[in-house]
Regions:
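A transmembrane-helix-recognition feature enriched in membrane-embedded lipid enzymes
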Residues: 1-63, 117-118
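Soluble catalytic domains of membrane acyltransferases
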Residues: 57, 61-164
Length: 164
């Protein structure tokens, strides 16, 4: 029975997920261009709240432990194992107080509504994994942003989703 339900629920989830991305893309643009970084950050937080809630369609729930141990107003490096799309939305939503910025592959900077815009304008580093010379200035730029503003940077060191 679960398997029978999983296919239509997966389609519904993917559809709703993509609709949220489409809805929030112009919202992010307006927030960033008319009201600045803080408004953009708030729009990204609400987008990710919607995406986290969308996961409930699949029966997914989140239990985050130890949030009281995450220091605020200090630069942080968050290193995680990349399991699924859920990683990113939960990190952005549940760690929004530490302003997570991502070190991401350059391909994600184009063509994905909301995601690409946020990566390009939200302070993340877009890395061309085939060009180390391009990566260094990007990493330096995000490191300075994180250090100067007490934000956090998130990196998935495996560089892609892990099977383990």
């Amino acid at each position: 029975m679960e398997k029978i339900l999983s296919y239509p629920l997966s389609i519904l989830y993917t559809l709703v997920f993509f609709i949220w991305l489409l809805i929030f893309h112009p919202i992010q643009w307006v927030c960033f261009n008319l009201f600045g970084y803080n408004a953009h950050r708030l729009s990204v937080a609400y987008l990710n709240l919607c995406l986290v809630r969308t996961a409930h369609l699949l029966g997914t729930t989140y239990h985050i432990k130890g949030m009281e141990n995450v220091p605020e107003n200090k630069p942080l490096i968050i290193v995680a194992n990349h399991q699924s799309l859920h990683d990113i939305t939960t990190i952005i939503w549940f760690l929004r107080k530490v302003h997570p910025k991502f070190i991401s592959k350059i391909e994600l900077g184009k063509g994905i509504p909301s995601v690409s815009y946020n990566l390009r304008h939200g302070g993340s580093a877009l890395i061309d994994r085939k060009d180390p010379k391009q990566a260094l200035p990007e990493i330096k730029k995000v490191a300075e942003l994180v250090n100067n503003n007490n934000y956090s940077v998130v990196i998935f060191p495996e560089g892609t989703r892990s099977k383990t």
